[in-house]
Amino acid sequence: MNEEMEQIIFQIILHGGNGRSSAMEAIAAAKSGDAEEARKKLQDAAEELSKAHHYQTELIQNEAGGEKTEMTLLMVHAQDHLMNAMTVKDMAAEIIELYEKITEQRGASI
């Protein structure tokens, strides 16, 4: 694996991890009643995942252009990390919405 490929893979892992962390922080903020912070953290997660997705797309475009991608354990880990982070972000959005509805039904605002 060449150095450029390693850098792309590490960027996917980095931004995927940052996105997942922000999504988890969004859930924690919603749980504590801070809707504004929850939405901000969810937006942060989306931005980080967008960066990771950019690098993933670069790999796909390179392969579509004839450049073969060497599948390594590190590459599989990066892809798994990104997909997991995307799922966590999607679930965080749903959980935040549930916290908001529950709080609204109780007569307060989250």
UniProtKB/Swiss-Prot annotation:
<protein>
    <recommendedName>
        <fullName>Lichenan-specific phosphotransferase enzyme IIA component</fullName>
    </recommendedName>
</protein>
<feature type="domain" description="PTS EIIA type-3">
    <location>
        <begin position="3"/>
        <end position="101"/>
    </location>
</feature>
<keyword id="KW-0762">Sugar transport</keyword>
<feature type="active site" description="Tele-phosphohistidine intermediate; by HPr">
    <location>
        <position position="77"/>
    </location>
</feature>
<dbReference type="GO" id="GO:0090563">
    <property type="term" value="F:protein-phosphocysteine-sugar phosphotransferase activity"/>
</dbReference>
<comment type="function">
    <text>The phosphoenolpyruvate-dependent sugar phosphotransferase system (PTS), a major carbohydrate active -transport system, catalyzes the phosphorylation of incoming sugar substrates concomitant with their translocation across the cell membrane. This system is involved in lichenan transport.</text>
</comment>
<keyword id="KW-0963">Cytoplasm</keyword>
<keyword id="KW-0598">Phosphotransferase system</keyword>
<dbReference type="InterPro" id="IPR036542">
    <property type="entry name" value="PTS_IIA_lac/cel_sf"/>
</dbReference>
<dbReference type="InterPro" id="IPR003188">
    <property type="entry name" value="PTS_IIA_lac/cel"/>
</dbReference>
<dbReference type="GO" id="GO:0009401">
    <property type="term" value="P:phosphoenolpyruvate-dependent sugar phosphotransferase system"/>
</dbReference>
<dbReference type="Pfam" id="PF02255">
    <property type="entry name" value="PTS_IIA"/>
</dbReference>
<dbReference type="GO" id="GO:0005737">
    <property type="term" value="C:cytoplasm"/>
</dbReference>
<keyword id="KW-0808">Transferase</keyword>
<keyword id="KW-0813">Transport</keyword>
